[in-house]
From Swiss-Prot:
NCBIfam families, sorted: PRK06483.1
Record family assignment: Belongs to the short-chain dehydrogenases/reductases (SDR) family. FolM subfamily.
InterPro entries noted in UniProt: NAD(P)-bd_dom_sf (IPR036291), Sc_DH/Rdtase_CS (IPR020904), SDR_fam (IPR002347)
Protein name, UniProt field: Dihydromonapterin reductase
One MF term in the entry's GO annotations: dihydrofolate reductase activity
One of the Pfam families matching this protein, by short name: adh_short_C2
Enzyme Commission code(s) on record: 1.5.1.50, 1.5.1.3
Claim: Amino-acid biosynthesis is one of the keywords in the record: no
Main EC class the enzyme belongs to: oxidoreductase
SUPFAM superfamilies: NAD(P)-binding Rossmann-fold domains
């Protein structure tokens, strides 16, 4: 890495949807990007060709998380930011042990960012006042709860709480914030009836797309003062 080259931004779960859009946003700005991915989608090849460093990671175990952190250290002496976007969505369902559901959700949404923030702390420090960032991607359900995804909601709530704890620990060098989205974009196979029902849950009645999140990420990275806060991107859904 050249002396004048910007420090890379690490995006976990950057192979699809919002993580992928954020990765492309930074690549288009000539900002170096490191992307973790679990499953090799065709989009990973596109990111690699555009200059991103894409690393397959297994966050299902603590050992896998720590092994990924060690790989990061071999590629860069510092990081501009860590965006914790890797996520899984698992409901309590008949036939699936509840302890497995809870363990899975806590592993990806709590253990993984907790261990990575500690393991990569040295790469975030030493660059100046408010010079680097951690952004946790949580969820709208942190505020409301969910009767069908109880473990998921609980794990995202824990991640939300860690935002404030890490903000206290890492200030003033590192800013730590959270983004709590609800519906941002649909899946290709979502039918018209589902889409309309989902849109009606917010005051704004629209799926804004990735740019709404990207603009917020840009704001948080450029701010020299904001830390320890969670930013809802929910179209007023909490008022319905």
């Amino acid at each position: 890495m050249g002396k004048n080259q910007p420090l890379p931004i690490l995006i976990t779960g950057g192979g699809r949807r919002i993580g992928l859009a954020i990765a492309w946003h930074f690549l288009n700005q000539k900002q170096p990007v490191i992307v973790s991915y679990r499953t090799h989608y065709p989009a990973i090849d596109g990111l690699t060709q555009a200059g991103a460093l894409c690393i397959q990671a297994d966050f299902s175990t603590d050992d896998g998380v720590l092994a990924f952190a060690e790989k990061i250290k071999t590629h860069t002496p510092g990081l501009r930011a860590i965006l914790h976007n890797a996520s899984a969505w698992m409901a309590e369902a008949p036939g699936t042990p509840l302890s497995d559901v809870l363990a899975c959700m806590m592993q990806i949404h709590v253990n993984t960012p907790y261990l990575l923030n500690h393991a990569l702390e040295r790469l975030l420090r030493g660059h100046g006042h408010a010079a680097t960032d951690i952004i946790h991607f949580t969820d709208y359900v942190v505020e409301r709860g969910s009767d069908k995804h109880i473990a998921y909601a609980a794990s995202k709530a824990a991640l939300d709480n860690m935002t404030r704890s890490f903000a206290r620990k890492l200030a003033p060098e590192v800013k730590v914030n959270a983004i709590a989205p609800s519906l941002i974009l649909f899946n290709e196979n979502d039918d018209a009836e589902y889409r309309q029902q989902a849109l009606n849950k917010s005051l704004m009645k629209t799926a804004p797309g990735e740019k709404e999140v990207i603009d917020l990420v840009d704001y948080l990275l450029t701010s020299c003062f904001v830390t320890g806060r969670s930013f809802a991107v929910d179209g007023g859904r909490h008022l319905r």
